[in-house]
Amino acid sequence: MEPVNVVVGIIVQGKKFLVERRRMDKKIDPGIICLPAGHVNSGEDLEDALKREMLEELGIQVKQMTFVCKNYYVASNGEKQHAYCYKITDYDGEPQCIEAAEIFWEDDLNNMTLDIDKETIRKMQRLKESH
């Protein structure tokens, strides 16, 4: 089966980044602590998908984003994913917990479940340092 496309949003506040704890009833990666993400619909532009997913999951309207990296990931249910990760640099609204079990600001990468999310944050931090 071909990998599906997903978009990942990285929202930073000071030295902290926004993470979510996925609900236990989710078929993909239940209960993990991860960056907010979602599937790209067929024919949908990646940036449009990110805007839609962040509105659905967090209730925010993304105004500006910067591409960080593309990752390959195999989810707990075996789904293969190409994850397009973006740092969200400007948005309207306050993040709300709409689809996850909870959302919170985290500053310790070790508290995140997925190594791929940890590496994505590191890549984003290196990009920031090189500019």
Whereabouts are the PLM-identified features?
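Conserved N-terminal beta-strand and adjoining loop/helix that marks the start
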Residues: M1-L18, P36-H39
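Conserved hydrophobic/aromatic beta-strand scaffold that supports enzyme active sites
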Residues: I10, V19, A83-K87, I103-W105
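A conserved beta-turn-beta hairpin within the catalytic core of GNAT-like acetyltransferases
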Residues: K26-G31
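The catalytic Nudix box helix
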Residues: L35-V68
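Active-site-adjacent beta-strand/loop module that shapes the phosphate/pyrophosphate-binding cleft
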Residues: Q61, N71-E94, D108
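NUDIX/MutT-family hydrolases
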Residues: K87, P95-K128
